[in-house]
Amino acid sequence: MTRYLLFALAATALAGAHAGDFDYKAYRPSSLSGAVAEHQKNPAVDFLVETGNFKYAVGGTYTGRHRETATPTRELIRRWVKALRHPKEYETLFDHEVEVESGGKKYWLPIQTPMVQSFASEVRAGGSVKLYIMLLGATKDTWVFAINEFQRQ
C-alpha cells in the first residue's frame, strides 16, 4: 500500500511539473493577418495540410461568439492528424471554435477542448487576449490556426 501511495505521489508531482512547461518562445510574435500573409495556397485545392509547424503569438479581441467546430475545419483536422500520424484521439481535440477580431477582420479559431472552460471564464466579450496559435492548414475558404494557449490581456 505504501509503495502504491509513493508511486501515486511521484506521478502527480511529475504531471504537475510538466503542466507549466508551455514553450512560449516557440511562438513568433505576429498578427493574425501577418500570419495568414506568410502562406499561400492554390484556390483550386479543397484542403491543405500544413506540416511545417508554424507557430505564432498574436493579439486579438474576443467577440464573445463561440460554436462547434465547422465541418470543413473538422475534416481538415482529421486529415492533419492522419498526415502527421498523431494519435486518432487528436481528431476530437478541437471540438469548439472562438471568434476573434484582429486588424478589422474576424477569425474563427479552433481551441483545444481542455481550454474551453478556462477561456470562457477568463476572457469576456470585447476583452483583449494573446493567443498562441499553430497553423494546421487551410480549407477551400480559410486558413485554420488552432489555439494552443492563451493569456487574457
Q: Where are the predicted features?
A:
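Amphipathic, low-complexity, repeat-rich surface-exposed segments
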Residues: M1-T2, I133
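Sec-dependent N-terminal signal peptides
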Residues: T2-A13
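OB-fold and OB-like single-stranded nucleic-acid-recognition modules
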Residues: H18-Q153
